[in-house]
Curated annotation (Swiss-Prot):
Catalyzes the transfer of a dimethylallyl group onto the adenine at position 37 in tRNAs that read codons beginning with uridine, leading to the formation of N6-(dimethylallyl)adenosine (i(6)A). HAMAP family: IPP_trans. GO terms for biological process: tRNA modification. This is tRNA dimethylallyltransferase. Substrate binds at residues 14-19. One of its GO terms (molecular function) is tRNA dimethylallyltransferase activity. Residues 37-40, 161-165 are annotated as: Interaction with substrate tRNA. Belongs to the IPP transferase family. Its EC number is 2.5.1.75. The keyword Magnesium applies. ATP binds at residues 12-19.
Amino acid sequence: MDKQSKIILISGPTASGKSNFAVKIAKKIEGEIINADSMQVYKKLKILTARPNKQEQKNIKHHLYGFVDLNEKFSTGQWLELTIKKIENIQKKKKIPILVGGTGLYFQSLINGLVKIPEIPLKFRNKVRLMSKKEGQKKFYKKLLKLDPKIKDKFDPNDTQRSIRAYEIKSYTNISMYDWLAKTKSEFNDSDFLKLHIDTKREKLVEKINLRTSSMLNNGAISEVKKFLKLKIKKDQSVNKVIGIAELTQYLNDEITLDEAEELISIKTRQYAKRQATWARTRMTSWIKVDPIKLDGYIKKLKKSSLKLDQLT
């Protein structure tokens, strides 16, 4: 693999302006963009997933957007395999790969490699989740420490999702999650990446989320959900997690008003952004925090030859 140039990674919460930032960088340094958002891989649902539109993709090559059938399951492992190939092809053309998205697990798999943990049955996982809910996070975390002492000080004790994952892995495989992680191997070195995280203040992000929700509803989201419902997608498909489907379905069934649907979509999006922020705070500590107000200034400092941002703070 040609590793003469760095690979740029751009993360940030939903509605933070990642896609636009990536396009501007790509124009400046002759880059091509690779999707790192688990919902934007699906066909259809362009509006609800906030997939870059034709104008945004104009003159800049975009990869791994809107190519997975809605009825297909698409794993992190599949994304990683395709992404590595895309990176290789882009670098062969002497261009810069720019990965942009909000799916932390995708970035983690690229940087650290993918953990080859055996698939844990859904019934078993649901049992652990129910236990977590009944116990409460504080009590559940203490129980996790007894089961797997190796996880102590490895992550925030208030991180519910990570606690659940650690518990189900240890209890099902009898091997600590961190022993599994130790077995992983990445195709890359950490020095191969320039990792940028758009660090948006919560008040500003809430404002942007509300504006984007309103824009989606005014630009075809309802029609998009009507078409989606006609496809009769299985309920266990990941695409059903796209924010807006459930809420607009309720509206179309006359269960709630459009204003109520809009508010619910905004609330759920804010909750998702909060989870993304927690991931970034606990698992992206080495990433460069980029002030969204100063994005254009950072782009001016970016040079293809060195791919370093000077005076970031």
